[in-house]
Amino acid sequence: MPRPELPLPEGWEEARDFDGKVYYIDHTNRTTSWIDPRDRYTKPLTFADCISDELPLGWEEAYDPQVGDYFIDHNTKTTQIEDPRVQWRREQEHMLKDYLVVAQEALSAQKEIYQVKQQRLELAQQEYQQLHAVWEHKLGSQVSLVSGSSSSSKYDPEILKAEIATAKSRVNKLKREMVHLQHELQFKERGFQTLKKIDKKMSDAQGSYKLDEAQAVLRETKAIKKAITCGEKEKQDLIKSLAMLKDGFRTDRGSHSDLWSSSSSLESSSFPLPKQYLDVSSQTDISGSFGINSNNQLAEKVRLRLRYEEAKRRIANLKIQLAKLDSEAWPGVLDSERDRLILINEKEELLKEMRFISPRKWTQGEVEQLEMARKRLEKDLQAARDTQSKALTERLKLNSKRNQLVRELEEATRQVATLHSQLKSLSSSMQSLSSGSSPGSLTSSRGSLVASSLDSSTSASFTDLYYDPFEQLDSELQSKVEFLLLEGATGFRPSGCITTIHEDEVAKTQKAEGGGRLQALRSLSGTPKSMTSLSPRSSLSSPSPPCSPLMADPLLAGDAFLNSLEFEDPELSATLCELSLGNSAQERYRLEEPGTEGKQLGQAVNTAQGCGLKVACVSAAVSDESVAGDSGVYEASVQRLGASEAAAFDSDESEAVGATRIQIALKYDEKNKQFAILIIQLSNLSALLQQQDQKVNIRVAVLPCSESTTCLFRTRPLDASDTLVFNEVFWVSMSYPALHQKTLRVDVCTTDRSHLEECLGGAQISLAEVCRSGERSTRWYNLLSYKYLKKQSRELKPVGVMAPASGPASTDAVSALLEQTAVELEKRQEGRSSTQTLEDSWRYEETSENEAVAEEEEEEVEEEEGEEDVFTEKASPDMDGYPALKVDKETNTETPAPSPTVVRPKDRRVGTPSQGPFLRGSTIIRSKTFSPGPQSQYVCRLNRSDSDSSTLSKKPPFVRNSLERRSVRMKRPSSVKSLRSERLIRTSLDLELDLQATRTWHSQLTQEISVLKELKEQLEQAKSHGEKELPQWLREDERFRLLLRMLEKRQMDRAEHKGELQTDKMMRAAAKDVHRLRGQSCKEPPEVQSFREKMAFFTRPRMNIPALSADDV
């Protein structure tokens, strides 16, 4: 019988409290009760008897405006916020205990990482001290530095300088890493202890919060969040003041120190071009698009609108994909695996440094201890490789895919923000964009991408607290993961493949036998015909980089030295006297020949005995046809002249007979200002090394080396065989203009038992034409044998080794010799066949007409440099039969003939299939890809609406007075706001985690504010002392460089700053949308996701403002 139909027992009465709550009076016992006495007959007595969601006798569900739903147990006269019908609290306790085990493992692994780093720091300090002592000893005799050391010596002056700079940079970097790691350890240790206290507190019998206790916790949490909001405002004010202080310092000193030669920019170059030729990437925009015609505004507007809608659809798809990936892994799982992976890499790095350290001044006991430590470390590493799990590989693969999606989402949001601003500036009435009337609008109330004003950077919310938007791995680990998964194998990586993270190197992979080979990315341009690149990726007058002024090595970049002589660099000319030069103009190796469009660069490494040979290294510069292939302005020629001559040089199949070759991939990361060098494999090693019982490694140096950058790296040693697979990557922090002035030196070396290094062969690669777009180019390079080079130098010694000379006579003699050998080479190359073998090229000849030819060529240069805006390149004999092409400046040309190119006269090479003269004329051949007028009429439909928009509509037909067509945003009243369909179940454990998390957040914010205040004091003190440059440690620390970028954003002009702010808001909103979508698509309930994020917060430090650096060496 239902309770309302049952009468109250005798002596009972129903009454109401002053707030309307019903209670019952027992007149017999003179007591009151909240429990209806009839419930004894209608309700279950225990929870075991309950059906569905009913509560047993004596339990009541109530609501508090501050706490929310809570439950009252009238039997014990207590309250609790946990639902007694749900066993969620017990599951939370189990999850917390499991997470404590994982966190303990990660913490112990990170402590071991710190110990290994400490050992590495001690070794690096010892190595730096030894190298510095060797440098001081060698510095006493400059003659021995130049003449006494060969290119294969460990103490080659330039290599020794790079060793010292790398060792110094390694010591400083390890110090900074240890300081950062120490702060992370402290944060994780505190978080781990906090979780342990929470677990102990909540495991007790009185672990549940009552109503008044929960209200007190919420009040404290709210007060801390207010303090956090004030702290965030103070932090932003400090950053603004730092941005103002930063303006008084020069922040680009690092690039200036690397650019020791002349600037490569057009404005500072001696290469006078008209203003309209300064941008060759799109000549159609020079004179034809200065302003958009009013007749074309509608078409431009429609085009931008379509791109805008497409970008928004792309963002929506990316958010769905990210939400799906995030639902497959919960926070904290990857952390322990990542720490174990980092620990293995740190141990391998320590092992590598133990192998390469030179124990010259060590005692026998110290050497034996080093060997024992090395063997013990090898055993530990082998055990770690054997226990590597397949699950780790799969999780790393998912994480790599997620980071790729995050990068794509960032690009898409930036594109949407840019298109939004363009649309607003294009039309005088863009109210339809900002009105929120169209579904999916940037600022619409539904489906908004832009975060509301409540989600400002200074407001504290639990979403910002627990959910770090799109947190990625650090750059080193992320790059390692990407290269780890390069092979694309879905199966388990075999043991023995975990590789090393070097100082600035990151990821290395080792392919399993029979695995898929890394495919080389073929270049879109052929072999260069001149030192100057006409690629839109680089400056028009960018020369190939000169070699180091202290390069006492016959392996020299001849292009670079000849090009530098054109600029008449007196310092370089004087330094050339230190080099071992011969009187002859012998040709040692074949010159590169042009490949057809789309083929890979020639693989032959071209070297010279002295500086006279035009090409002594493989230049990475693009071909003269790069304008046609890359910019889209000219149509690339179908067939280049001399293609038959290039057949032996333009592909991987053109391997020189008996030459050792190395495959290298180069990539520049514009966002992080880092240059990646991937050493893939070495083939035909038997040509350099006869004994197969030695270990071989690759030494890589970026020369000339600056003092503040790690520029010398070594791969791990492998047992000698005909083909060696390394797959190791090295990262160099460097600006893109500075990279253009660098040369990459690659040496194959062996190390004996006494740790002495001997170089067998090498090559030098120009970095002048490294692509800025982030694409990776993979090429093969032939290596020059140093033994063969020394043998030839002993046979031919007409000049001998010259000591450093500073007089003008020596400089003139070297310059004359260089010009003489260069012209000799040009004359000899005209009559040579492209199939001439390497042995035939070693001939000694002299020509008496060199000086006269050189003088005539210099006169040509002076005459042609006098022209203001047209440069004519003298055609080769093969081009005499081709008529000159006439081109209009404002249009493009389409012809199967070679594309005209602007080239400096001394940069051209004789025997090259050269181009026709670049002259003005009346004949105009228009490109298929561009026309000044519309090919067909635009079909426009005007829509009459409240917003008076005239864009091409994709919406349903117009309906007058419809809400979706109004220009004024219609806000829903608060009464109609939909309530949450589900309410998260909150327990006492959730409240305690929230309280401790806000305390931790506030503590971390206080530390960041103190760091910013200290940094501000240091900068003010440096400014008061008259210093013009930022401290060196501040420029080198990667985390502080990110802070400097943040400061630079604040100094942008108003339009750029507004666009950056809009992009940041969109990314924050997208992160929250992904978080919301993940809760909808995840198989687990949202309570589980939320609780895991709360636990992971305490052991995942977010160091937004790093600690101040330790003292440098």
Swiss-Prot record:
Residue ranges, annotated region (Interaction with PRKCZ): 953-996, 956-975
InterPro entries found in the cross-reference section: C2_dom (IPR000008), C2_domain_sf (IPR035892), C2_WWC (IPR037771), WW_dom (IPR001202), WW_dom_sf (IPR036020), WWC/KIBRA_Hippo_Reg (IPR051105)
Ranges of biased composition (kind: Polar residues): 522-532, 924-938
Annotated ranges, domain C2: 658-781
Top-level lineage group: Eukaryota
Gene Ontology CC annotation, any one: perinuclear region of cytoplasm
Residue ranges, annotated region (Interaction with histone H3): 839-1113
Key words, A-Z: Activator, Cell membrane, Cell projection, Coiled coil, Cytoplasm, Membrane, Nucleus, Phosphoprotein, Repeat, Repressor, Transcription, Transcription regulation
Tissues where this protein is expressed: Expressed in mammary epithelial cells and breast cancer cell lines. Found in the luminal epithelium surrounding the ducts in the normal breast. In the brain, expressed in somatodendritic compartment of neurons in the cortex and hippocampus and in the cerebellum it is found in the Purkinje cells and some granule cells (at protein level). Detected in brain, heart, colon and kidney. In the kidney, expressed in glomerular podocytes, in some tubules and in the collecting duct.
Subcellular location per the Swiss-Prot or TrEMBL entry: Cytoplasm, Perinuclear region; Nucleus; Cell projection, Ruffle membrane; Cytoplasm, Cytosol
Stretches the record annotates as Disordered: 429-448, 522-547, 825-975
Intrachain S-S bonds: none
Single Gene Ontology MF annotation: transcription coactivator activity
Compositionally biased residues, Low complexity: 533-542
Annotated positions of the Phosphoserine modification: S141, S535, S542, S899, S927, S931, S947, S975, S978
Role noted for this protein: Regulator of the Hippo signaling pathway, also known as the Salvador-Warts-Hippo (SWH) pathway. Enhances phosphorylation of LATS1 and YAP1 and negatively regulates cell proliferation and organ growth due to a suppression of the transcriptional activity of YAP1, the major effector of the Hippo pathway. Along with NF2 can synergistically induce the phosphorylation of LATS1 and LATS2 and function in the regulation of Hippo signaling pathway. Acts as a transcriptional coactivator of ESR1 which plays an essential role in DYNLL1-mediated ESR1 transactivation.
The name this protein goes by in its record: Protein KIBRA
Protein's organism: Homo sapiens
Gene name as annotated: WWC1
